[in-house]
């Protein structure tokens, strides 16, 4: 057992929130390292449903520390709303949540820029959540962003805010996308936000590294999925942050040498929200069956997810980028009623058959999936928590995925509750989780 990264191996929505929540009790700290409030982790505890967008799922475990790393962009209003909701539900937040002083701050102007630019003529529609995440990261990369540490220094913040917002207004007006903002009222509101979060702000890189040196363990919680990574995803239909394993280091300030392992989370099928290529998307009614059985609607937006079949070339690609030690397969029970389960094993582009992910969207949109069909099991797997109790055909399906991807399946989720989970004895997953 050591310091472990848990992240999505597909296009997000793989069920990471449940897995992080379930195993957080075995770690001392859970740290988020990228993204913003555009990605929601849904966790069920008995009759209670929690949708966490910024705060790590580990906050739901008594006595565990939760860290929001420097790689995130933070809308203070969204963060404080989440804190208030947790506290109202009896979850202790103060003293358990730590916010990086180097994380960037998201403003209403960022939302304005995103909403308007997404609809501009000639612009490729990415299908964003319109929460301003991309424009905030743009400011970060352009070195004009405002960080949490800046927000806490009132005099410095006021000067920086005036300069940045003046530029934003000029750009928005030039592009014809300006909508009226009361910049003074927003500034005052953010100064009030600063006082509420001040007790939780620190240098989280120091906190994490000191904890690791003292023998404590950290779980790094990824948001979204590798295929939405700014560098390695289906660009430009991606998010604006590093959603792969490398982002855990840059987004927290913890060195790669201090990471013990990487666990990938994947559905037993695959889904995607928003635009972009999706080679195995099912259009023949099977996609609708998966969506209804799996309740595939976005945790943040409520949008119906596009659904399709497991994509082996995609998984091999994300396993290679992240160095997965083990896979978690979620929502196995969603496939319980299928007689045959197609699995994409390669792609055909024209008269060529390829087994690797094409690098461009243009090529991705031309691929035809090559399927092999695996027999279904037509027996309920819902709630099973012991591998030996799975139907033989369900075990064969998991073995097939292992053989095709080259990565062990060390954990299987068969329902939304904590106890509806299988950990395979002797697996690399078990050794990393402890």
Curated annotation (Swiss-Prot):
Mg(2+) binds at residues 13, 40. Pathway: Purine metabolism; AMP biosynthesis via de novo pathway; AMP from IMP: step 1/2. GTP binds at residues 12-18, 40-42, 305, 331-333, 413-415. Its cofactor is Mg(2+). IMP binds at residues 13-16, 38-41, 129, 143, 224, 239, 303. Transmembrane segments: none annotated. Gene3D superfamilies: Adenylosuccinate Synthetase, subunit A, domain 1 (3.40.440.10), Adenylosuccinate Synthetase, subunit A, domain 2 (1.10.300.10), Adenylosuccinate Synthetase, subunit A, domain 3 (3.90.170.10). Keywords: Cytoplasm, GTP-binding, Ligase, Magnesium, Metal-binding, Nucleotide-binding, Purine biosynthesis. GO terms for cellular component: cytoplasm. Its EC number is 6.3.4.4. Its main location: cytoplasm. It is found in: Cytoplasm. PROSITE patterns: ADENYLOSUCCIN_SYN_1 (PS01266), ADENYLOSUCCIN_SYN_2 (PS00513). GO terms for molecular function: adenylosuccinate synthase activity; GTP binding; magnesium ion binding. CDD domains: AdSS. It holds the Pfam family Adenylsucc_synt. The active site is at residues 13, 41. It catalyses: IMP + L-aspartate + GTP = N(6)-(1,2-dicarboxyethyl)-AMP + GDP + phosphate + 2 H(+). Homodimer. PANTHER family: ADENYLOSUCCINATE SYNTHETASE (PTHR11846:SF0). Plays an important role in the de novo pathway of purine nucleotide biosynthesis. Catalyzes the first committed step in the biosynthesis of AMP from IMP. NCBIfam families: PRK01117.1, purA. Belongs to the adenylosuccinate synthetase family. This is Adenylosuccinate synthetase. It comes from Solibacter usitatus (strain Ellin6076). The lineage of its organism: Bacteria, Pseudomonadati, Acidobacteriota, Terriglobia, Bryobacterales.
């Amino acid at each position: 057992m050591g310091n472990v990264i848990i992240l999505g191996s597909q296009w997000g929505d793989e069920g990471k929130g449940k897995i992080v929540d379930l195993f957080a009790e075995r770690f001392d700290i859970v740290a988020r390292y990228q993204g913003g409030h555009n990605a929601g982790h849904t966790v069920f505890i008995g009759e209670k449903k929690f949708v966490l967008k910024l705060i790590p799922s580990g906050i739901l475990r008594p006595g565990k520390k939760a860290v929001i790393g420097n790689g995130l962009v933070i809308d203070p209003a969204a963060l404080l709303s989440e804190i208030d909701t947790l506290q109202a539900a009896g979850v202790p937040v103060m003293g358990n949540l730590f916010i990086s002083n180097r994380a960037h701050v998201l403003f209403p102007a960022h939302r304005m820029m995103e909403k308007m630019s997404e609809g501009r003529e000639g612009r490729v529609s990415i299908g964003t959540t319109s929460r301003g995440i991309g424009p905030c990261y743009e400011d970060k990369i352009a070195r004009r962003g405002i960080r949490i540490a800046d927000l806490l220094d009132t005099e410095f913040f006021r000067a920086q805010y005036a300069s940045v917002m003046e530029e934003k207004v000029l750009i928005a007006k030039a592009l014809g996308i300006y909508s009226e903002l009361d910049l003074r009222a927003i500034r005052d509101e953010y100064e009030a936000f600063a006082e509420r979060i001040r007790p939780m702000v620190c240098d989280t890189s120091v906190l994490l590294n000191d904890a690791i040196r003292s023998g404590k363990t950290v779980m790094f919680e990824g948001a979204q999925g590798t295929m939405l990574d700014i560098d390695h995803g289906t660009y430009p239909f991606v998010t604006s942050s590093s959603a792969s394993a490398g982002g855990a280091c840059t987004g927290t300030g913890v060195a790669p040498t201090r990471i013990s392992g990487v666990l990938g989370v994947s559905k037993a099928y695959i889904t995607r929200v928003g635009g972009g290529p999706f080679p195995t998307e099912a259009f023949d009614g099977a996609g609708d069956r998966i969506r209804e059985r799996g309740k595939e609607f976005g945790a943040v937006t409520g949008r119906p997810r596009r659904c399709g079949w497991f994509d082996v070339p995609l998984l091999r690609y994300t396993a290679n980028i992240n160095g997965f030690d083990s896979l978690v397969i979620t929502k196995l029970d969603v496939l319980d009623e299928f007689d045959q389960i197609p699995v994409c094993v390669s792609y055909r582009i024209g008269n060529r058959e390829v087994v690797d992910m094409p690098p461009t969207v243009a090529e991705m949109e031309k691929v035809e999936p090559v399927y092999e069909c695996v027999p279904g099991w037509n027996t309920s797997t819902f709630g099973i928590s012991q591998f030996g109790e799975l139907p033989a055909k369900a075990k064969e399906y998991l073995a097939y995925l292992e053989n095709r991807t080259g990565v062990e399946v060390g954990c299987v989720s068969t329902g939304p509750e904590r106890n509806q989970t299988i950990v395979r004895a002797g697996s690399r997953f078990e050794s990393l989780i402890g």
